[in-house]
Amino acid sequence: NNLDEIK
């Protein structure tokens, strides 16, 4: 899970 991709 890469939440940094959701910007």
Swiss-Prot record:
Superkingdom, natural source: Eukaryota
Identification of the protein by name: Unknown protein 20
Protein's organism: Pseudotsuga menziesii (Douglas-fir)
